[in-house]
Amino acid sequence: MTFNHKKMEPKWQQYWSEHNTFKTTEDKDKENFYALDMFPYPSGAGLHVGHPEGYTATDILSRMKRMQGKNVLHPIGWDAFGLPAEQYAIDTGNDPEEFTALNIANFTRQIKSLGFSYDWDREINTTDPEYYKWTQWIFEKLYENGLAYEAEIAVNWCPALGTVLANEEVIDGKSERGGFPVFRKPMRQWMLKITAYADRLLDDLELVDWPENIKDMQRNWIGRSEGAEVTFKIKDSDETFNVFTTRPDTLFGATYTVFAPEHELIEKITTPEQKEAVEAYKKQVELKSELERTDLAKDKTGVFTGAYAINPINGEEVPIWIADYVLIQYGTGAIMAVPAHDERDFEFAQQFGLNIRPVLEGGDVTKEAFTGDGPHINSDFLNGLAKAEAITAAIDWLEKEGIGSRKITYRLRDWLFSRQRYWGEPIPVIHWEDGETTLVPEDELPLLLPKATEIKPSGTGESPLANLHDWVNVTDENGRKGRRETNTMPQWAGSSWYFLRYIDPKNSEAIADKEKLAEWLPVDVYIGGAEHAVLHLLYARFWHKFLYDIGVVPTKEPFQKLFNQGMILGENNEKMSKSRGNVVNPDEVVEKYGADTLRLYEMFMGPLEASIAWNENGLEGARKFLDRIWRLLVTEEGTLAEKVTTDANANLEKAYHHMVKTVTNHYENLRFNTGISQLMIFINEAYKRDTIPKQYVEGFVQLLSPIAPHLAEELWEILGHTETISYVAWPTYDETKLVEDEVEIVLQVNGKVKSKITVAKSLGKEELEKLAHEDDKIKENIDGKTIRKVIVVPGKLVNIVAN
C-alpha cells in the first residue's frame, strides 16, 4: 500500500497558499529567527536537483523554529540581472526582461512544487525598479563618501561578448561563458574602494560562526602583508621607483629588478637598442590573462630594458627587466628580485643568466633557491642576524636614510564595479561637457533602464546603452550638454544587500525600517554553495559595513552563521552539466516519487556539507521509508490504523523520548541524515509493537514534518486535527525516561566472551555471579574444571578463571 503524492502534494500546497500559512509573524513576545538561502539566478534551464539541497536545509530549520514558537523570516527572491539573459537577447533579438520573467515563473512553479515554506509576500527581484532604486541609492552614498571613483584600468576585454569580464570570469585566456578569446585593454571604469575596509573585513571574521576554511579563503583573498616599501633610483636619470617587499633583510641579495609590462616608466627608460624587443614583448603579454601570467608551472619569459637601477643598500647597479609574472595591479608594479631565496626569481635568473647571490646561510643556490631561514651572510651590518632582527634592522636603516619605510599591503584590489552591458542596474551618474560629473538627484531615483528594441554591443567597448542616443544625451536647465554613464553595475550589486530588503520589501522611503532591521539582523543562518565563499560574501560584508558606518544598519556583520552545502554530482561522480548530459531535473523526480521523497533523499544522502553522487536507488529507498510510515499508520480506507491507541505503552516510551531528543539536536546542528536515521529506528520499533500510543505518533509526525511536510499534514489530518501542523508546539522529551534501567553483561571464561545476558542495572556482585553460573553456555565451558577465581564488574562483566 502506498500514498498518492500526485493528489496529496498539490492539495497541501494549495492549502498553504490559500491560508497564507507561512506569512512572517512579527509577534513582539516571540524571538526572531532569520533563515536565508542564497537567492538563485533564474536561468533558462530552470531548477536542478542541486538547488533544493540548501533550500530544504533552511526549510527544515524554518519549519522547526515556527513550531518552537519563534517568528520566522524565510524569504525567496531572484538575482535576475546578469550576462546570460543579455547574451540570449543578443543571440535571439528577444527582450531580456521578458526572458527573465518567463524564467522566474518557471522557477516559482518548481520551488512551490517542492513545498518550501517561503513567505511569498516578501519576494524580491533585483531587476524591479523599486528594488534597484535602493541599489542605486547605495552607490550614490558610496560616491558621496569617496568610496566610488573612476580610473583607467587594464581590463579583460572580450570582443565577442562585447564586454569587460572580471578575473573570475576568465579561464585560461578565454571567457568562462562561450570560451571566447579575452585581451587586456585599458578602459575608464568605476571602482569601489573595498580596500578601505580591508582590516575590518579581516578582523571581524572573528565575530561570526563560519566554517574555518571559508574564513581562510577570505583571509587569503584580502592577503595582508607586513614589510617595507623601498625606493630605487634609476642610473643616469632623475627617475625613481618603489618596490614593496616582505623581506627587506634580503636587499643585499637583490641582483635585478622586474617591472610589469604596463609600468609607466618603461617607455622613458628603455634604451634604443632594446626598444623593438620591449614593444614586441608588451604586445605578446596583452593576449594573456592574469592566471596565465602568474602560472608557476610555465616557462619564465621576459626582456631586458637596457636600463639599470641602483640597489639602495649597497650602491650596486642592477639590471631592470620586464616580465609578465609581475602584475601592475599588485603592489607597485615593480619587484626587487632575490633569486637565491625565491623560486620564481631563481628560475628567471637561471633562464636569463642573471647573478644569484646568497644572503642566508643554508642550501645550495647553484642547484635551487634556498627558501628556509638561516643567519644572514654577504649582508654587511645584517651578517649573523636571524630573520626577525634583520628585518627590523633593515627597515630602521632604510627609514634613517630616507629611502624606505614600514608598510602594510593587501592582495585585495578595489572592486571593479562597472560592466559594459545593457542588462544591469544603470549607474546614476552624468558626465557634463565641462568635465564635471554629477549624480542623478536622489528624488529622481530609480534611474530606469531604458527599453531597447535591439541589444547589440556598441563595438567601442561601451555598453549597448551607448547606442540609445535619446537616453544617453541630456541637457541641464542652463543648456549644458551631458552624457549619462553607459556602464551598468555588475550582478554582484543587487546580491550585496538583498537580505536587508526582505526585512521590509515594500518600503518606498528607505531600504528598510530601522526598527525592523534591528529586530531581524544579523541573519541567523545563511546556507549556500561554497563557490560564493569569497566574492559574494566579501562584497556583501563590505556594503553592510559601509551601511553600518552611515547608520543604516545596526550590526557590523550581516550573517551570523554560514553553512555551505556540498555539491550533488552526477551518477558517475562528475559535476552535473548540460554538456555531460547528466543533469537531473527535479520536475521528473517530483512527478515520479513526490517532493517529500526528493527532500528526504537529499537530506539523507550524507552529511549536508559532503559532495555526493546522485543515485536513483537512494530515491527508491527514501520513497519506501515514507510508504512504511503510511502503511503503519493508515488503513486501506485512508483512516487511522487500529494499532494507534490512546493507551500508554511503556515499551515505546524510551524509544520515543530518545527520538525527540536526538532528532531535535541533529536538526539544530544541520545533521539531517542522522536525524532521519533516528526517525527510521523509531518506525522499526513501532512495527514490533501491537499498539502505538497516539501521542507518540503525533510527536513522530511533527518531527517528520520539516522533512516531508505534505505527508505530515495528511497524517495530521487523519489523526483528527483540523488546523495545519505548521504551528503546533514542537515535541519535548523527558530526560528521566532516557535513563537505562537495564544493562548488557558480558560473561567470560578465562577472558574469552562465551555469553551475554541483559539484567537490571542495580544487580550486585553476588546476584551477577549466581546468574553467570546458571548460564548454559558458561556451564558447558567450565564443566570438569576447577574454578580458581571469579571477577565481577557490576554493569559490565563476569569473568570466571577455571582450569
Swiss-Prot record:
Main localisation: cytoplasm
**Entry annotated with the keyword Hydrolase:** no
One Pfam family assigned to this protein is: tRNA-synt_1_2
Which range is the signal sequence, renumbered to this chain? none
Give compartment(s): Cytoplasm
User: GO:BP terms for this protein?
Assistant: leucyl-tRNA aminoacylation
Which PANTHER family has this protein been placed in? LEUCINE--TRNA LIGASE, MITOCHONDRIAL (PTHR43740:SF2), LEUCYL-TRNA SYNTHETASE (PTHR43740)
The name under which this protein is listed is: Leucine--tRNA ligase
Species this protein is from:
Listeria innocua serovar 6a (strain ATCC BAA-680 / CLIP 11262)
